[in-house]
Each structure stands twice: as C-alpha cells, then as structure tokens.
Amino acid sequence: ISNKTVQSLDTKADEYFFGGGTQNGRFTHKGKSINIANESSWTDGGVSSPNPFYWSTEGYGVLRNTFKDGKYDFGETSAEVVATTHNESEFDAYYFVSNDEDVNGKAETLLNEYYTVTGNPMLLPEYAFYLAHLNCYNRDGWEESTSGNWVLEDGKTYRELGQASGYVIPENTYAETLNNEGPSVDADNFKGTVNEDTYKFSARAVIDGHVDNDMPLGWFLPNDGYGCGYGQNGYYQTRTSGEDTTRRDSVVDANVANLASFTEYAEANGVRSGLWTQAALTPDASEQDSRYNGFQNLRDFNKEVNVAGVSALKTDVAWVGYGYSMALNSVKDGYNILASSGKRPTVVSLDGWAGFQRYASVWTGDQTGGNWEYIRFHIPTYIGQSLAGNPNIGSDVDGIFGGSDLITTRDLQFKTFTQTMLDMDGWGSKAKKPYITTDPYISINRMYLKLKAQLMPYIYTAAHEAVDGLPMIRAMFLEEANDYTYSTATQYQYMFGDNFLVAPVYQDTNADEVGNDVRNNIYLPGTSDTWIDYFTGEQYRGGQIINNFDAPIWKLPLFVKNGSIIPMYEENNNPMAITETNEKGLDKTRRIVEFYPYGETSYDLVEDDGITLNYDEATNERDYGGEVTTHIT
C-alpha cells in the first residue's frame, strides 16, 4: 500500500501481545498500537530501542527483517485484526512457532527462536550488576559558593562553572581531574587550578567517598558527558597546517597514561573502569569528526582498552546516530574491541534494533528525576523490554537531571532488583551519590546496595538463565497466567527470577514528610502459594490483592515464595577479591543460603569467574570461561 507493507492476522478475544522493544511505560499491547521507530524519546509513551519483533500468547512470533519504521496495531482499529505495517515496499519476515501449552514455555521457545536469528543476549560481568558512577572529570571548573547546590565529600557547597563557559574550564577555578594531576603535555591552554586542595574534585575522591561511607560500587566511567573529551593533555590544541601526527600522538598517549593511572587506582579499590563514547574510536577518525575541537577530544580506543585497562563502554545518540543499523554497527565495534582484551565487555547504549542484545544492555536515556513519575513509568518499561528480546536493561538512579533524596532511595530499592543501575552525576540539581544526603536516606541506600551485593549468586544465576531462557525481570503472567496478569493491572510489580516478587513504591499514596507510606494493589498469585514478607517474615496467602501494605521509607515491598532457596554471599562492596586496599571485596568461599521450607524444592546455582570472555568474532561464539553448577536441596 503506497510503499508500505502490511501483515494482517486474525486475533482472538483472549490473545495478548508483547514485544516491540523499549516501549516506555508499556509492556502489554492488546487493544493498542505501538510505533516501531526510533523516536529517541525517553519518557512515558515514547520509544527508544525499538524492535520489529512481537509474540503472541497463541504461540507465534514475528520478526520483520527491516530497518524501516513501522506501526503495530494490536486490535486498536479492529478488535479482530492485528495489523503490522512497515514503510517499505518489500515484505520480509521470520515466523516463529511454539507448541508449548503453557505461556512460560511459549515465551521461552519464541524468545530462543528470535535469538537463533538475531543472536543470544550478552552475559554481563559480575561487576556490572553493582552500582556504577558516571561523570565527566576532564571538563568542569568549580568554586566555593553559598548559593551553590552541590555538596561534595568535604561537606561544603560549590557551584560548577565549566558547562556555562562552553565546556572550557575558567581560569583560576578548581579543575576536575581523574587523579588530581593536571596536564603536562601541550597544556598551555589549560587555565584551571590543580593543587592539594582540589583532590575533592577528582574521580578518585568519589571512589574514596564510597569506601569511606561503606557503599558498594562496581564500575566507574570518568568521562561521561558532552564536551568531556578523553583527557586534559593537549587542551584545545590542534595540528597546524602541514604538521605531522607526532605531537598529536604524544597527547593521546599522555591521556591514555592518565586513564591507566585512574584504572589502577580504581581496581585497587575493587572498581572496574570504562568510558563514554562521543566520537570516533581512533585519532585519525576523531580529527575528521565535525565535533572535534581540540586534542583533548582525540582518542585511541584500542589503547584505552589494552593499555589503560577499561572494560566498559557507554554510548548514546552522539555515537549511535539515528539508531537502526548504525546503532548495531556502533555497539558491535565497541564490543569487539573490548572483547579483544579477554575481559567480558559491559556496553550500555540506546536507540537499538533487533540484534542489539548481542552487544549491549539497553539504557533508557536522559530523564529528569526528583519525581514519582520517573519510577512509575520505568517499571512497565523494564517488564516490556524483558519480553521483547533483550533481558538487560537499566537506567539512571533518580534520573540524570533534577534530584530528590526520597526518590533516590525509593529508586535504589527498585533497582536493587534489576540489572544495571547508574549514578549519572554532574548534570542534576544535586550530586548523584548515595552518601551525599542525610539519614535516614544514607543508611537505607547503603542497606539496599549491600543487599544487592549479597544477592549476587541469585542474580548472576538468573542472568545466566536469561541468555537462553526466561528474562530476569518477569511479567506476573509468567508466574500465573490469566486475564488479570496479562493486563495493565499488574504493571507495577514483577517477578525477579523464580522466587522474588517485587512491588516498588512508585507514588505518594499517603506519605509523611520522610516518605513512610503504604503500597496498594499488590497481587499475590497462586491460591496454593504462600508469600513471605522478605523483611519481616509475615506470611500471606496467594490469590489475593493486598492494599495498605506498610511501606516505611526503609522498606521495599518484597516477597519471597514459600519453598524458595536463595543463595547469597556475605556482605561485600564489590566482586573483586579482598586485598589490603580492597578490604570490602568479595570472598567467594564464604556463602549464605536462605531456605524457605515447603515441600521438596531445589535450586541450581550457576557460577563462573564473572569476568572472562573467549570470543570468536567471526562466528559470534562466546565462551565465558567455563561454569560450575551446584545443586542445592
């Protein structure tokens, strides 16, 4: 139809549909239409990382083989017809069929058939499930100010000046750095102040802040942000006409050495490092980029990986462009370079398409925090993305912009039972660090970060399963399938793996000034099941809806199913081994197993070293270094 191709299929009254990629605020599509288009829209109703794949509870799935925009009408126009349209004249599609009788079997079969065509999801390294900190430590200048709204580790208030000056550090302001060391190569244009008093503005100081406040931290991106560049050597210097690359290359090497120094310090404290990517991956390509305006924006990604030791990469619209095939090629290039080190890559990106799951975890984009809407719309977004072929998804803790102590704490509670969680610092109305606040929020933030660290055996086993099985974050119909759980009635709760039911606090129902509240409309499935309040031990019969569930500020509504076996570690702040400099690292020889006895149950714990990857780029074959399964009864 006028350069459009339309697939029309009959639908049944009791048929439900899922997929379509990252459809913000939505997970179930019956009676609605969704856009399969990269809208780069990060809020409710928008689309980021679309995917031309959907599946039905009737046991079929469809993947359109296209990079053209589309619209999928799941009975909005006609309740008896599913009409999926793409803006191209050629119709090309893969059809998947499941003969399983239950919806869990259908979901697993159809997702695996989708993976057969597009590739299995990447398995994240262990550290990627811990909190990440991202900011730009090459770009900004600071001054102490009573009118500032940023409190740093010394307890004083500052205001930032670099962004307002076009990402040039103003003269005589306190300069941010990675290691509290100013540039030494081609540094004539660098006018910021670096001395013994400026350590508080360094990336190292943030690692120290987590250590001093006993807060878990797994990875760190010290250059996340537009205008940040990849160092301060060669600050706003460029090659003169006819000049060779000798001076340029010495600047790149100096910046890589500075990054290597930070990586060494970070790893000594149990923290892995990574980089944000704005432009190209080599110095030659960087100089050709339209955004290039100085040697500080040059990079050599191979050296950053193999000399400086970075293992993580975050990209956004500055690099993946309009998305579609460009996004796939971008994350593939980054993944392959990271994988060349033998370490398992962490790639966080957006604006993806079918196949994105091979190389990247979905990041939902830039949003404003400090409001309940931020948590609310993310819950169904995570559920929906997990049903759409990429089980790895994450977002910023309390957004990149704005900020609120209460929302930060409630968001951390929610994200404890998700995959990746990012402190996106440097852009909001306050510092995005879990310890830059007051009690009770500091203690609660610590409690949940430590709980996630302890639950890593359970989380990591679920991550292994998600590579070729059901996702970690599961819609409630995968626990109990009926019209109620297929609908939006359960869109604000989910199963995390087989055993945890998570019902985040996502609105002010009847909160006091601190944030103590209640949670309504919690559905506990299974009339023969018993659900146990994880924090109090109180038991609830399944097959009911709970209202006025007590949710004081410290408490996430969290239930564990009777009969569950939960493997855990002892308290730790990162997954690296305990050393003299990493006293709160992980001792994997010391375990905790929580039993909730009911009948005969068992648990298969899956482990590997959490970091290794042997990768054949030509065949896309991945070996995660061997794994061990422990059967617990």
Q: How would you label these PLM feature ranges?
A:
Residues I1-S8, K12-E15, T22, P216-N445, ...:
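Aromatic- and carboxylate-enriched substrate-binding clefts and catalytic-loop regions
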Residues I1-V185, N189-T193, I207-D212, F549-E570:
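Catalytic and substrate-binding clefts that recognize carbohydrates or anionic sugar/phosphate headgroups
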Residues K32-S41, G46-N51, L110-V117, S202-D208, ...:
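Short alpha-helical segments and helix-capping/turn motifs at coil-helix boundaries
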Residues T43-V47, N104-G105, S145-S286:
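Aromatic- and glycine-enriched glycan-recognition loops and surfaces
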Residues S49-F53, E58-Y60, F91, G218, ...:
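Residue-level detector of short, conserved catalytic/binding motifs and their immediate flanks
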Residues L110, Y199-V206, F262, F301, ...:
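Alpha-helical packing segments of well-folded alpha/beta enzyme cores
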Residues N336, F356-V362, T381, L387-S395, ...:
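Catalytic core of carbohydrate-active enzymes
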